[in-house]
Amino acid sequence: MQELKRAREIIDDVSKETDSILLFHSLSGKDSIVLLDLCYKKFKRVVVVFMYIVKDLEHIMRYYNYAKTKYPNIEFVQVPHYALFYDIKTGYMGIKQDPKQRQWTLADITEKLRKRLGVEWACYGFKQSDSLNRRLMLRSYTDGKEAINWKTKKFYPLSTYKNKEIMDYILDHRLKNPEANGTNKQSSGVDVEDIEYQKFLLLQ
């Protein structure tokens, strides 16, 4: 598979610079499932970062338990999802509002974790096929693979993957399938439309 070869080359390039990474993971989404499997084999220290909106949802914990068994040397940290800060600030869907709530971005969270954990490089599962914004961002990189930002020390091994290729990798390597919700849509990990999240908001 051409895309698998490309992803491994991207990871190899970064592994020559560092043996430790932050890996932002949705805990059950298909892209994250593939990303962890690829990176675990190449880095001595893999810190899996899960950004939660609601802690300890059942489908999230199923994948967490699976991953800790399959990849025993991973470290795991949970931090609030940046969307949660916006929800609190605006009182979205009835959540208790705090107009003074500071807003955080993914970049802010990454920098905070870098300082806290002493890990410089960060890995994300973004793909060009996800959206126009991601396609434009990834194609702006000059690494030759449209996947590594050497200046910011961020990399995206799945940059040129398509969803079918992601699922083929999961099947070929016999990894845990991504969760499916009641509408048969595959899980992307944390989804603000998830029924458990909506129930959580109503209780606040």
Protein language model annotation of sequence segments:
Residues 1-204:
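Nucleotide-activated chemistry modules centered on ATP-dependent adenylation/adenylyltransferase
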